[in-house]
């Protein structure tokens, strides 16, 4: 019939179902009657509690038909499926970066805000988000709780481990619809898709040159400043970026972290490994 006889006096929202109406009133009262026995977190609705409780188990009942990745909620699976289609419907007006979901865009927009209320007690670095602070603090503790069962490599966050595992399985679930090329992560697919569109959303304010990726713009901007602030203590060579210095230092230490899965030969730089792998 479409009748909604139950109207909320607080906000005017109407309901056809009395049970939904009663649950809605609890929201205004701040009452969350359903509590998780594992962590104490409280929820307004019983189904929200049930969905939450999957976090405390290894159960992932919602499986992607494309790549087999499991998720604890139907919404999580639906969000993941967008990675396979390559849809990026939400664009940041500040920098042009695109996102699969509105919530990811909202989270990103905080990086453009000057407001950073979350402060690290160890080093004073500020963050716009609480989870960003939490992840940063692992640097000080050295904690890397997510361990690869194949090779023992540890990671600070679970998504890093999940991506790393694909180096062992050689899984490449993200396919470009334009050329058929496949990628291990959705991010790499999005970066690749720009090669088909020719889009270069990141523009240098100094000279107007445009780039497909923000990292390329950041590197380019150093050519205007001429700054080489990172100095090698071994040989005195200076670099414009800390990661360039870190790679250079491997020549002194002999560290070769990039290993070929085919022949076990190791390299100090990832691009050298990629060039080598073409020989197989």
Swiss-Prot record:
Its main location: nucleus. PROSITE patterns: ZINC_FINGER_C2H2_1, ZINC_FINGER_C2H2_2. A zinc finger (C2H2-type) spans 6-28, 34-56, 62-84, 90-112, 118-140, 146-168, 174-196, 202-224, 230-252, 258-280. One of its GO terms (molecular function) is RNA polymerase II cis-regulatory region sequence-specific DNA binding. The keyword Acetylation does not apply. One of its GO terms (cellular component) is nucleus. SMART domains: ZnF_C2H2. It is found in: Nucleus. Belongs to the krueppel C2H2-type zinc-finger protein family. This is Gastrula zinc finger protein XlCGF46.1. It comes from Xenopus laevis.
């Amino acid at each position: 019939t479409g009748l909604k006889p139950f109207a909320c006096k607080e906000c005017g929202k109407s309901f056809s179902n009395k049970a939904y109406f009663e649950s809605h009133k609890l929201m205004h009262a701040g009452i969350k009657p359903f509590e998780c026995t594992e962590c104490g977190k409280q929820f307004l609705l019983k189904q929200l509690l049930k969905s939450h409780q999957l976090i405390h188990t290894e159960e992932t009942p919602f499986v992607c038909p494309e790549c087999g990745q499991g998720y604890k909620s139907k919404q999580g699976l639906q969000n993941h499926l967008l990675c396979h289609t390559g849809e990026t419907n939400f664009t940041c007006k500040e920098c042009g970066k695109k996102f699969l979901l509105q919530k990811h865009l909202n989270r990103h927009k905080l990086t453009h805000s000057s407001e950073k209320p979350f402060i690290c007690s160890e080093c004073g670095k500020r963050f716009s988000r609480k989870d960003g602070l939490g992840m940063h603090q692992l640097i000080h503790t050295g904690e890397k709780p997510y361990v690869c069962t194949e090779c023992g490599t540890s990671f600070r966050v679970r998504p890093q481990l999940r991506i790393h595992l694909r180096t062992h399985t050689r899984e490449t679930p993200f396919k470009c619809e334009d050329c058929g090329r496949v990628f291990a992560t959705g991010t790499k697919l999005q970066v690749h898709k720009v090669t088909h569109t020719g889009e270069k959303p990141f523009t240098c304010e100094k000279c107007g040159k445009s780039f497909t990726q923000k990292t390329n713009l950041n590197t380019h901007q150093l050519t205007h400043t001429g700054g080489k602030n990172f100095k090698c203590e071994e040989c005195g060579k200076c670099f414009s970026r800390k990661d360039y210095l870190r790679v250079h230092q491997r020549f002194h230490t002999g560290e070769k972290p990039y290993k070929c899965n085919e022949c076990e030969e190791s390299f100090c730089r990832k691009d050298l490994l990629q060039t080598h792998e073409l020989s197989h």
